[in-house]
Amino acid sequence: MTCTIDKILQDAKTLLERLKDHDNAAESLIDQSSALHKRVEAMKEVGTAMPEKYQEELADIKDASKLKPHVLLCQENTQIRDLQQENKELWVSLEEHQYALELIMSKYRKQMLQLVANKKPAPTEPVLEAHKTFSSDLECQIDRICVMGDIMRDAIQLDEDKAYNIQEKLAQLELENKELREILSTSKESLHSSKRESEWNFSEKTQ
């Protein structure tokens, strides 16, 4: 039982480390979104007079806003589902250990009651010493399970919070992606219009 409890405690700690990695990935995603937002603002300031040299950058921004955030968020959502499933499995294992301890304590109490009821004149010190040792071991096991339960509750709460935050960030990125596409469309139309106007003016002059 001790080895199994140690393994569950280690799994819980590993889960917390994974959630921290998940948080770091989300922060990286926010940084990417901020960079895209700054570039959007820069394009708004330039307006319809955007030089030709920015066309390649616009294409890169479009590809990044269209693919990269979506792929990363899909990966994050998959990790969230995996962590939620792992949380459920660890929680079930914890409940099984608690139930096993309750059964052990129940049988132990029955044996002690039978021993007291059927006791004969005999030295009581060995029985008391055994009772003390067994009780101490059980208390240690119960304390460790309580600690593990607290870790699991914190991990589950953290996992739920991260899932909610990822959904918010997904909505924000989708909105920014929509704005980027609108700006790209407007910029292209403006450039085409300017080009047509220049060609028309040139043809007028030549005539």
Swiss-Prot record:
Indicate, by first and last residue, each region the UniProt record lists as having compositional bias (Basic and acidic residues). 189-199
InterPro entries linked: SIKE
Q: Per the record, which residues fall in region Disordered?
A: 186-207
One MF term in the entry's GO annotations = protein-macromolecule adaptor activity
Provide a GO biological process annotation: negative regulation of hippo signaling
* Record's keyword terms, sorted: Coiled coil
Q: Name one GO cellular component term.
A: FAR/SIN/STRIPAK complex
Q: Which parts form a coiled-coil structure per UniProt?
A: 4-32, 154-193
Assigned protein family:
Belongs to the SIKE family.
- Oligomer status and interactors: Interacts with IKBKE and TBK1 via its coiled coil region. Interaction with TBK1 is disrupted upon viral infection or TLR3 stimulation. Interacts with CDC42BPB. Associates with the STRIPAK core complex composed of PP2A catalytic and scaffolding subunits, the striatins (PP2A regulatory subunits), the striatin-associated proteins MOB4, STRIP1 and STRIP2, PDCD10 and members of the STE20 kinases, such as STK24 and STK26.
What is the role of the protein in this entry? Answer: Suppressor of IKK-epsilon. Associates with the striatin-interacting phosphatase and kinase (STRIPAK) core complex, forming the extended (SIKE1:SLMAP)STRIPAK complex. The (SIKE1:SLMAP)STRIPAK complex dephosphorylates STK3 leading to the inhibition of Hippo signaling and the control of cell growth.
Q: What is this protein called?
A: Suppressor of IKBKE 1
- Organism the protein comes from: Xenopus tropicalis (Western clawed frog)
